[in-house]
Curated annotation (Swiss-Prot):
GO terms for cellular component: cytoplasm. Keywords: Amino-acid biosynthesis, Arginine biosynthesis, ATP-binding, Cytoplasm, Kinase, Nucleotide-binding, Transferase. Its main location: cytoplasm. Its EC number is 2.7.2.8. One of its GO terms (biological process) is arginine biosynthetic process via ornithine. It comes from Deinococcus radiodurans (strain ATCC 13939 / DSM 20539 / JCM 16871 / CCUG 27074 / LMG 4051 / NBRC 15346 / NCIMB 9279 / VKM B-1422 / R1). It is an enzyme of class 2 (transferase). InterPro entries: AceGlu_kinase-like_sf, AcgluKinase_fam, ArgB, Asp/Glu/Uridylate_kinase. This is Acetylglutamate kinase.
Length: 249
């Protein structure tokens, strides 16, 4: 199973370590690949160095100067997460060309779209009983680093390995009538998600989350789950279908 971890769930050190412990425990039941972003950490490091943050369409404009800071921040976070999980191998997407990408839009600078995953490397590590922890910096066609979206990376890795993806976020699933707690959908098909987007009951911050789930399905993942990363124990519950929203083809 591929677990995408990031965002607000990373802001609390105690919560981050609790999730890492859960990942370490769950690894005994199933092979795991962890994909992480680092938005809050990156913001802090950029601000500390006086590098301005600019976004276009929700994506960070990444100058060469900003790319250096992004890669440094993700490397530090990658090492910390790997240590917290235990029996894990921290990898950046540039290691052994784990993640290959092309420039998404010249206006965004060093921002990429994933075009390939070194699935063989991941399978080798999983076969050795290790948990790959992947930071989202890819190698571009020019050999230089590209900043890639963690949700998209998780979907690409899930598709390359033929495994399901779990997107840990700050909400506990997709609701048909948010915030009514009884309206959380346990499972949705791709068609139902598209209907929800068209009808407007999937809206706001949930839109990019379900888009990431649909992208994972489109890349070959058998399912994608959106679940809360703010609650201890949710990963095992989501794997059993007891938490979050499972999206299927």
């Amino acid at each position: 199973m591929i677990v995408k971890y990031g965002g607000n769930a990373m802001k609390s050190l105690d919560l981050r370590r609790a999730v890492a412990r859960e990942l370490g425990t769950l690894r005994g039941a199933m092979p795991l690949v962890v994909v992480h972003g680092g938005g809050p950490v990156i913001e802090r490091e950029l601000a500390a160095r006086g590098v301005a943050s600019e976004f276009i369409g929700g994506l960070r404009v990444t100058t060469p100067e900003a790319m250096d800071v992004v890669e440094m921040a993700l490397c530090q976070l990658n090492k910390q997460l790997s240590q917290d999980i235990g029996q894990a191998v921290g990898l950046m997407g540039r290691d052994d060309e784990l993640l290959r990408a092309e420039v998404l839009d010249p206006q965004l600078g060093r921002v990429g779209r994933v075009t390939g995953v070194n699935a063989g490397l991941l399978r080798t590590l999983l076969g050795a009983g290790l948990t790959p922890v992947v930071g989202c910096v890819a190698v571009g066609e020019d050999g230089e680093a590209l900043n890639v979206n963690a949700d998209t990376v998780a979907g690409a890795v899930a598709g390359a390995l033929g495994e399901g993806a779990v997107f840990l976020t700050d909400v506990d699933g997709v609701y048909r009538a948010y915030p009514d707690p009884d309206s959380r959908a346990a499972q949705l098909t791709r068609a139902e998600v598209e209907d929800g987007l068209a009808a407007g009951w999937i809206a706001g911050g949930m839109i990019p989350k379900v888009r990431a789930a649909l992208d994972a399905l489109g890349r070959g993942a058998p399912f994608a789950i959106i679940a809360s990363g703010m609650t201890a124990g949710v990963l095992a519950q989501a794997a059993r279908g007891e938490a979050g929203t499972r999206i299927v083809p």
